[in-house]
UniProtKB/Swiss-Prot annotation, chains A, B:
SMART domains: TOPRIM. A zinc finger (C4-type) spans 58-73. The keyword Nucleus does not apply. The lineage of its organism: Bacteria, Pseudomonadati, Bacteroidota, Flavobacteriia, Flavobacteriales. Keywords: DNA damage, DNA recombination, DNA repair, Metal-binding, Zinc, Zinc-finger. Belongs to the RecR family. CDD domains: TOPRIM_recR (cd01025). One of its GO terms (molecular function) is DNA binding. This is Recombination protein RecR. Disulfide bonds: none annotated.
Length: 205, 205
């Protein structure tokens, strides 16, 4: 694309580096900002800069937080002995929205993925193992997405925990509530039969 | 959505005010920025701010420009007596990409649209009429998109020009090059028959 303005070109170039945003979309977004009051652009720039410069990770669970210890870890009514291992803050938000979990989290910050150059040392696996070795945790719940990378990460952590007396579990895989069996994929349906639960348990909440 | 961080919430709120970007996409973009080097966020913020604060409109054609007179208007090899009326810079870029047009442009900055509260006074119609009255222009080419708003705007300008000796034209509507007649809509096909051109003209470039 040939731009009549260097300023416009720079803004579009920077914008189009965001994932899923091409040059055309970037141009549309930037032209939208030009039509809005200058304040909107100022606030957007300020919010992004402040976030990037001042954001902290919770000292205990490595979730994104404004304080040294995040709200969840600082809440005394939550069970600190149960820890749910997740990939990032989006998973924490999804589980929190269910209202079904009262334990702590441990945010890995990604999954082991040699293809993307992400090894165990780039993730917060070491602090998790240390917490376990310090005897602070009774149970670890693996809640990573069930992809090749997710399974690899689960297995790596599981291996690291060998020799400790900790209880490990993983979230149940099965047919979604409200789904038709007919349209479910074989792997999920197969797992939901193998891991069937006593009927009386399914009537709780 | 409940965020564990006010900074994150603010950034997502500002980001999701852009058109076509919802809360979830905004969160994905913001988390992406957090994973990239701090420099990327700094440059994005800077580029957006500089654009918004320093951008100029060309004194002659009202296109976005870094200088008082844009490159096209300042180019002496272009024909200043023919003016193509377009909606915004994207249309200028599209026509420039064809390499078929050597005249000037006049960027309206929008279309007359009472539904969105945009009247003739918010557009650069007055300066266009003044240029015509000053006798600087021989021909005006209307190149707005053929929607209700585009047609209204064309007609409004056409009416304003009544009494002047200026030649007006509009870009040809018809079947796209390479398209099958079978799948063309009736209005376009009808227009392309009514406005048929001598066959020998169609063989030029």
């Amino acid at each position: 694309m040939d731009f009549s303005s260097k300023l416009l070109e720079q803004a579009v170039d920077e914008m189009s580096q965001l994932p899923g945003i091409g040059k055309r979309t970037a141009l549309r977004l930037v032209l939208h900002l030009l039509k809005q009051p200058e304040e909107q652009t100022t606030q957007l720039s300020k919010a992004l800069l402040e976030l990037r410069q001042n954001i902290k990770l919770c000292n205990n669970c490595y979730n994104i937080s404004d304080t040294e210890l995040c709200e969840i870890c600082a809440n005394p009514s939550r069970v600190s002995e149960i820890v749910c291992v997740v990939e990032d803050i989006r998973d924490v938000m999804a589980i929190e929205n269910t209202g079904q979990y009262r334990g702590h989290y441990h945010v890995l910050g990604g999954k082991i993925s040699p293809m993307d150059g992400i090894g165990p040392s780039q993730l917060t696996i070491k602090p998790l193992i240390e917490k376990v070795q310090a005897g602070k945790i009774d149970e670890i719940i693996f809640a990573l997405s069930s992809t090749l990378e997710g399974d690899t990460t689960n297995f790596y952590i599981f291996k690291q925990l060998e020799g400790t007396a900790i209880k490990t579990s993983t979230i149940a895989r099965g047919i979604s509530v409200g789904d038709e069996l007919e349209y479910a994929d074989e792997v999920t349906l197969g797992r939901s039969i193998t891991n069937r639960i006593p009927f009386e348990n399914s009537m709780k909440s």
